[in-house]
Protein backbone atom coordinates (compact mmCIF):
# COMPACT_ATOMS: atom_id res chain seq x y z
CA UNK A 1 0.00 0.00 0.00
CA UNK A 2 1.44 3.35 -1.04
CA UNK A 3 0.58 6.10 1.43
CA UNK A 4 0.71 9.52 -0.15
CA UNK A 5 -0.28 13.02 0.97
CA UNK A 6 -3.77 12.55 -0.50
CA UNK A 7 -4.32 9.59 1.83
CA UNK A 8 -3.31 11.69 4.82
CA UNK A 9 -5.71 14.43 3.70
CA UNK A 10 -8.58 11.92 3.45
CA UNK A 11 -7.75 10.42 6.85
CA UNK A 12 -7.76 13.82 8.54
CA UNK A 13 -11.16 14.65 7.01
CA UNK A 14 -12.55 11.24 8.02
CA UNK A 15 -11.27 11.61 11.60
CA UNK A 16 -13.01 14.99 11.87
CA UNK A 17 -16.25 13.74 10.28
CA UNK A 18 -16.35 10.76 12.65
CA UNK A 19 -15.94 13.00 15.68
CA UNK A 20 -12.41 11.98 16.66
CA UNK A 21 -13.73 9.06 18.68
CA UNK A 22 -10.51 7.12 18.77
CA UNK A 23 -7.64 9.46 18.04
CA UNK A 24 -6.29 12.91 17.26
CA UNK A 25 -8.91 14.85 19.16
CA UNK A 26 -7.00 18.01 18.24
CA UNK A 27 -8.56 17.74 14.76
CA UNK A 28 -12.04 18.11 16.27
CA UNK A 29 -11.07 20.87 18.68
CA UNK A 30 -10.09 23.16 15.80
CA UNK A 31 -12.70 25.65 14.69
CA UNK A 32 -13.79 25.46 11.05
CA UNK A 33 -11.61 28.41 10.03
CA UNK A 34 -8.44 26.89 11.49
CA UNK A 35 -9.26 23.45 10.07
CA UNK A 36 -9.92 24.88 6.59
CA UNK A 37 -6.69 26.90 6.70
CA UNK A 38 -4.72 23.77 7.54
CA UNK A 39 -6.40 21.71 4.86
CA UNK A 40 -5.83 24.42 2.24
CA UNK A 41 -2.11 24.29 3.08
CA UNK A 42 -2.19 20.51 2.64
CA UNK A 43 -4.06 20.97 -0.66
CA UNK A 44 -1.31 23.30 -1.85
CA UNK A 45 1.40 20.89 -0.71
CA UNK A 46 -0.32 18.08 -2.64
CA UNK A 47 -0.59 20.26 -5.75
CA UNK A 48 3.07 21.29 -5.65
CA UNK A 49 4.35 17.78 -4.86
CA UNK A 50 2.35 16.19 -7.68
CA UNK A 51 4.26 18.26 -10.25
CA UNK A 52 7.59 16.79 -9.16
CA UNK A 53 6.63 13.09 -8.74
CA UNK A 54 9.21 12.27 -6.04
CA UNK A 55 9.92 8.56 -5.39
CA UNK A 56 8.63 9.02 -1.80
CA UNK A 57 6.27 11.60 -0.34
CA UNK A 58 7.65 14.63 1.48
CA UNK A 59 7.12 15.29 5.17
CA UNK A 60 3.92 17.08 6.07
CA UNK A 61 4.00 20.86 5.98
CA UNK A 62 5.46 21.95 9.35
CA UNK A 63 2.47 24.12 10.19
CA UNK A 64 0.14 21.13 9.72
CA UNK A 65 2.33 18.71 11.64
CA UNK A 66 2.63 21.19 14.52
CA UNK A 67 -1.15 21.63 14.72
CA UNK A 68 -1.68 17.86 14.59
CA UNK A 69 0.70 17.39 17.49
CA UNK A 70 3.58 15.59 15.79
CA UNK A 71 6.30 15.06 18.44
CA UNK A 72 3.88 15.68 21.31
CA UNK A 73 3.82 12.11 22.51
CA UNK A 74 0.98 10.51 20.53
CA UNK A 75 3.44 8.61 18.35
CA UNK A 76 1.09 5.69 17.65
CA UNK A 77 -1.84 7.71 16.31
CA UNK A 78 0.36 10.16 14.42
CA UNK A 79 2.37 7.28 12.94
CA UNK A 80 -0.82 5.54 11.80
CA UNK A 81 -2.18 8.77 10.33
CA UNK A 82 1.05 9.16 8.35
CA UNK A 83 0.94 5.55 7.14
CA UNK A 84 4.00 4.34 9.02
CA UNK A 85 4.44 0.59 9.56
CA UNK A 86 3.71 -0.58 13.11
CA UNK A 87 7.29 -1.87 13.48
CA UNK A 88 8.64 1.62 12.70
CA UNK A 89 6.18 3.29 15.09
CA UNK A 90 7.29 0.93 17.88
CA UNK A 91 10.97 1.49 17.13
CA UNK A 92 10.52 5.27 17.14
CA UNK A 93 8.57 5.24 20.42
CA UNK A 94 10.49 2.61 22.33
CA UNK A 95 14.00 3.58 21.25
CA UNK A 96 13.46 7.35 21.03
CA UNK A 97 15.02 7.57 17.59
CA UNK A 98 14.75 11.12 16.27
CA UNK A 99 17.17 10.89 13.37
CA UNK A 100 18.87 8.52 11.00
CA UNK A 101 21.57 7.01 13.19
CA UNK A 102 24.69 4.88 12.92
CA UNK A 103 22.66 1.67 12.84
CA UNK A 104 20.78 2.92 9.79
CA UNK A 105 23.96 4.02 8.05
CA UNK A 106 25.58 0.64 8.71
CA UNK A 107 22.66 -1.01 6.88
CA UNK A 108 23.33 0.89 3.66
CA UNK A 109 26.06 -1.58 2.66
CA UNK A 110 23.54 -4.42 3.04
CA UNK A 111 21.08 -2.93 0.52
CA UNK A 112 20.89 -3.96 -3.11
CA UNK A 113 21.34 -0.53 -4.69
CA UNK A 114 20.07 -0.30 -8.27
CA UNK A 115 22.52 1.02 -10.84
CA UNK A 116 22.30 4.77 -11.35
CA UNK A 117 20.80 5.51 -7.94
CA UNK A 118 22.71 8.09 -5.93
CA UNK A 119 20.64 8.48 -2.75
CA UNK A 120 18.19 6.90 -0.35
CA UNK A 121 15.24 9.21 0.29
CA UNK A 122 12.62 9.28 3.09
CA UNK A 123 10.11 11.85 4.33
CA UNK A 124 11.80 14.04 6.96
CA UNK A 125 10.84 12.88 10.40
CA UNK A 126 10.21 9.30 9.31
CA UNK A 127 12.75 7.17 11.15
CA UNK A 128 12.35 3.56 10.02
CA UNK A 129 13.03 0.65 12.32
CA UNK A 130 15.53 -0.42 9.68
CA UNK A 131 16.51 0.63 6.17
CA UNK A 132 15.67 -2.98 5.31
CA UNK A 133 12.03 -2.61 6.47
CA UNK A 134 10.14 -4.13 3.55
CA UNK A 135 6.84 -2.57 4.58
CA UNK A 136 8.37 0.92 4.59
CA UNK A 137 9.72 0.33 1.07
CA UNK A 138 6.34 -0.97 -0.12
CA UNK A 139 4.58 2.08 1.32
CA UNK A 140 7.06 4.34 -0.51
CA UNK A 141 8.43 5.75 2.74
CA UNK A 142 11.93 4.72 1.70
CA UNK A 143 13.13 4.88 -1.88
CA UNK A 144 16.14 5.29 -4.10
CA UNK A 145 16.68 8.38 -6.24
CA UNK A 146 18.80 8.86 -9.31
CA UNK A 147 20.51 12.18 -10.04
CA UNK A 148 17.52 13.64 -11.88
CA UNK A 149 15.08 12.61 -9.13
CA UNK A 150 17.46 14.00 -6.51
CA UNK A 151 17.65 17.33 -8.35
CA UNK A 152 13.82 17.45 -8.55
CA UNK A 153 13.56 16.68 -4.82
CA UNK A 154 15.81 19.66 -4.06
CA UNK A 155 13.70 21.85 -6.36
CA UNK A 156 10.51 20.57 -4.69
CA UNK A 157 11.89 21.41 -1.25
CA UNK A 158 12.77 24.92 -2.43
CA UNK A 159 9.28 25.48 -3.83
CA UNK A 160 7.58 24.11 -0.71
CA UNK A 161 9.69 26.41 1.48
CA UNK A 162 8.85 29.39 -0.69
CA UNK A 163 5.11 28.72 -1.13
CA UNK A 164 4.42 27.34 2.37
CA UNK A 165 6.46 29.57 4.68
CA UNK A 166 6.69 28.59 8.33
CA UNK A 167 8.68 29.33 11.46
CA UNK A 168 9.37 25.81 12.70
CA UNK A 169 13.10 25.76 13.53
CA UNK A 170 13.50 21.99 13.24
CA UNK A 171 12.07 21.78 9.71
CA UNK A 172 14.55 22.86 7.09
CA UNK A 173 13.98 19.92 4.74
CA UNK A 174 11.03 17.83 3.62
CA UNK A 175 13.16 14.75 2.84
CA UNK A 176 15.83 12.78 4.68
CA UNK A 177 18.66 12.09 2.25
CA UNK A 178 21.41 9.51 2.50
CA UNK A 179 23.78 10.30 -0.36
CA UNK A 180 25.38 7.16 -1.78
CA UNK A 181 27.86 8.60 -4.27
From Swiss-Prot:
InterPro entries in UniProt: DUF483 (IPR007556)
**Top-level taxon of the source organism:** Archaea
What family classification does the UniProt entry report for this protein? To M.jannaschii MJ1106.
- The entry's protein name is Uncharacterized protein MTH_236
Give the organism, scientific name: Methanothermobacter thermautotrophicus (strain ATCC 29096 / DSM 1053 / JCM 10044 / NBRC 100330 / Delta H) (Methanobacterium thermoautotrophicum)
Amino acid sequence: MVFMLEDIYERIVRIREEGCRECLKVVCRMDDFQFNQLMSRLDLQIEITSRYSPPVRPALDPMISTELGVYRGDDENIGRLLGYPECCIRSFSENTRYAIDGEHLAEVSELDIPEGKCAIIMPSGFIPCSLRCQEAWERKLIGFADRDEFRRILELEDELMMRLPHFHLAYDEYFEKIVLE
